[in-house]
Every structure is written in C-alpha cells, then in structure tokens.
Regions:
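Conserved amphipathic alpha-helical "coupling/scaffold" segments
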Residues: 1-152, 156, 259-262, 266-272, ...
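SMC-family hinge/dimerization module
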Residues: 186, 190-221, 231, 293-324
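Intracellular alpha-helical coupling/juxtamembrane segments of multi-pass membrane proteins
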Residues: 156, 160-163, 237, 241-276
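Phosphate-binding P-loop/Walker A region and its immediate neighborhood
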Residues: 254-315
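Extended, charged coiled-coil "arm/hinge" scaffolds of SMC/Rad50-like chromosome-maintenance ATPases
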Residues: 127-140, 230-250
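ATPase nucleotide-binding head domains, primarily ABC-like/P-loop NTPase cores
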Residues: 286, 296-438
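Extended, Lys/Arg-enriched charged tracts that mediate electrostatic binding to polyanionic substrates
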Residues: 154-203, 282, 299
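Active-site phosphate-binding and catalytic loops of NTP-dependent enzymes
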Residues: 80-86, 108-114, 170-185, 278-289, ...
Length: 438
C-alpha cells in the first residue's frame, strides 16, 4: 500500500491527469485519473507488456480504434433494476457493442506472436451482434422507435397519419367558409388539439371548444366542433402508439438486462485497453523507454532521466528546459544521501526517481535513456518539504514526524547485508534516498 500522502508529495495525481488526456474514451479518462497501483510485480509486468504491445501496434500504424465506445454502466444498472431504457440509451449500447467488436477484430487480426497478452484479454469478449442489429432495427438514428419495430405500431401510425389528414382537411374547409372570422388563415395547436385563431367578437361563427386566448383577448383559439371527435380519436391513437413504443423499449431493455453481466465485463476490457493505449501514447509523447525490473543483486540504471511533469510544463506551458539526471546505484548500496546547496536540484531528483518507480509499477515507460533498469519496489515512502519549526506550524511538523516514522519503520524490516539469518533478504528491498534536509 502506498499512502496517499506520498502520492501527493510526488505529485502523482498530476501525472495521472496528464495520462488521462491520452485516453480515447470517458471510461479510460476516469480510470487514468483514478489509477490503481498494482500490488505485485507480476501485475506490473502484465501492464508493461500490454503497453508494449499497444506501442508496437501504434508503430505499425494500426492503433486501437475506440470509436463508438460509450460509458453505458449506468444504463446497464438501470436495465438490471427493471428501469426503462430510452432510444438514445439503447443506441449507446449498440454503438458500444459495435466499437468493442472493432477493437477485437483489430487485435485478432495480428499475429499471436505480436500481441499474445492483448489477444488473451479479448478472447472471451462477447459483443452480441444480434442485439446490436435488433436495436438498430427498432430504433432510428434520432432515438425514436421505428415503424418496422412491430406490425401493431406500424398500423397505429398509419391511422394517426390518416386522422391528422382528416382533421387538416376539415379545418381547411372551415377556413375557406369562415375566412372573415379568422385573425389569420392558420391551423395551429394548443396542447395536442388542432385549433383556429378566431376573432373574439366572431367566436359564434365557428362553434367549438376554446382552448386558449391571446394576451390581449382579441384572439380565441378554438377547436371547431366538426373536428372534436377526430381530435379525441387522435389522442387515443397517440396514447396507444406511446404504449406500443414503450412495449418495444421494454423488450429491448430486457434483452440488454439479460446480458448485462457480459456487457459489464466488456466495459472492463475496453477500459483496460484504453488505459493501455493511453500509457503507450503518453510514453511515446514522453520519448520514454520500457523499464526492466531487476533482481536484488543488479545495479539500478537510469540515465538521462527526466521529470515527466517538467517535460509537460516545458511543452505545454513554455517552461524551462528540463535538465536530465543520471541515477546509477550498485546493488551493495543500502542508503543514498543527496547533499548540496539550496535550489541545487535535490528535491526534483527525489521526486523524479519516485515518479519513475511509480510509472514502472503502473505499466508506463520511464522517460530515460535505454536501458531502464530498476527494482520493483513494494513501498514508496517520501517526506519532502522545507524545514519547519514547531512555532511556525505544529501540524506541518507533526506531519513530517509521522511520515519519517513510517519510513524508519519500513527500514527496520530490511535485513542488513551481512545477516546470517536463514531467511533470505527481501527480493526488492527498498533503497532509501534521503535528502540532506531530513
């Protein structure tokens, strides 16, 4: 477990925010911003291989396509809870199924030797093309239920069209006969009723139901008695049409609910792929190289290591040129103390090394010259800041003491180099780096 205090001191959340800008989907963006740090070296190694495979794919000009992928997690939950999905939500499901299928085709289209990890990741991905086709059969591009969704719906809509035409024709005839009673020759609507704008003094010329009046009271909007019965029929047909459309939406929602667990797995795979793609693109942008996790008897080698946040600042905010550092440590070293004058780069060096360790753990390449060789470190602990007196800030001072206590407790768990204990040393014991201010 890496404490959030340490991550904040190293400005890890800022790096995650930068990583998220390379994601292609909302799912990937959110996952990058809330990046999980693996608990085992095997998990980190798996993520690194994913990054390398996507990196290779990008270099071949065949990057992963994420078009059409939507965050449908809430829609799946709604369907599982017997809610009703609307047309737009169903289209999002269909679009995501299609997008996931394109992702799988791109990955499966490569040689198994080139993308073994990614192909294993999508091997059990179910994209339900028949569900996608059924949704598009029943829902048009605007999210409305289509006439072809059911024979009953088509019949109701034919009747609706015919009834509207009858109403329009009758109103046209009334307008021709009673033109002098109208404010203007116009058929309009109030609510779901068709009405004519009649001059108030001549309302008796067109008997019917008054549904509205103008602000001045000079115009009354009257539904002529001759079309009231048709208006009632129209309203009934509209209610029947709405009910039938909801039947279609309910059927489609139930089909989505029936496969919701598979679709949740699909979203998880898509998110993992988008994260891998974001890591690869961010690594390429940083001109970084893949790290190799070394054993306890190998030296740490980080040449021309650059602080990733300073690289971002230089390129996006016209910051100063980033000065690279070299970190070369033999396996025999137990502690490294960095000394030097103020503003000499000690803190930046510590933060750069801390971020390099974290980047390797989450499957990112490290912005250093090849070879990039460092141990997989389980615990990363940091206490970075200026000296504080108790009088200046008791809370700040207490915070320093608490963090230093954690570091010392972790150091007590590391066996000395000359131990004769039958228990072997930890395979990746942390090498503390202490700034002179501590």
């Amino acid at each position: 477990l890496i404490h959030q205090e340490t991550l904040d001191l190293l400005e890890w959340p800022r790096l995650c925010q930068h990583l998220s800008t390379f994601a292609a989907t909302k799912l990937g963006t959110l996952a990058a911003q809330q990046l999980t740090i693996p608990a085992t070296e095997a998990d980190s190694q798996q993520l690194l291989v994913q990054t390398q495979e996507v990196y290779w794919l990008d270099q071949q000009g065949q990057g992963l396509p994420f078009g059409g992928i939507r965050d449908i997690g809430d829609d799946l939950l709604r369907a599982q809870r017997q809610g009703l999905l609307g047309g737009d939500q169903l289209l999002a499901v269909a679009s995501t199924l299609h997008g996931a299928r394109q992702l799988r085709r791109t990955i499966d289209g490569q040689s198994p030797e080139d993308l073994p990890v990614l192909q294993a990741l999508v091997a059990n991905l179910r994209t339900y093309p028949e569900l996608e086709q059924h949704i598009h059969h029943c829902i048009d591009d605007r999210g409305d239920v289509t006439d072809r969704a059911s024979p009953k719906l088509a019949t109701l809509r034919d009747k609706l069209k015919s009834t509207r035409q009858d109403i329009q024709q009758r109103l046209q005839r009334i307008m021709q006969r009673q033109a002098g009673a109208l404010q203007e020759p116009l058929i309009t609507q109030r609510g779901d009723r068709f009405v004519l704008p009649v001059k108030a003094p001549q309302k008796d010329a067109i008997p019917g139901i008054v549904h509205d009046a103008s602000a001045s009271g000079a115009t009354l909007y009257i539904e002529p008695q001759a079309v009231v019965s048709l208006g009632n029929s129209l309203r009934q047909l509209q209610q029947q049409e709405k009910a039938e459309a909801e039947v279609i939406l309910r059927q489609l929602t139930e089909q989505v609910a029936a496969v919701a667990e598979d679709l949740e797995d699909l979203l998880a795979v898509v998110t993992e792929l988008d994260l891998a793609s974001a890591r690869a693109r961010y690594s390429l942008w940083l001109e970084a190289n893949p790290p190799r996790f070394i054993t306890a008897d190998e030296p740490i080698t980080l040449r021309q290591l650059r602080h990733p946040l300073l690289v971002w600042q230089q390129r996006h905010e016209q910051g100063p040129e980033v000065v690279p550092i070299n970190v070369l440590m033999s396996a025999q070293l137990r502690v490294v103390a960095i000394t030097g004058p103020n503003t000499g780069g000690k803190t930046v060096t510590l933060k750069t090394l801390g971020l390099a360790v974290l980047m390797a753990k989450v499957g990112l390449f490290v912005p250093a010259r090849e070879p990039v060789e460092l141990p997989w470190i389980e615990q990363v602990l940091a206490d970075i800041g200026d000296e504080q007196s108790i009088e200046q800030s008791l809370s700040t001072f207490s915070g320093h003491i608490r963090r230093i206590g954690r570091i010392l407790a972790a150091l007590e768990q590391v066996p000395p180099p000359d131990t004769h204990s039958p228990t072997p040393p930890l395979p990746h014991s942390p090498t503390p780096l202490l700034p002179h201010s501590l």
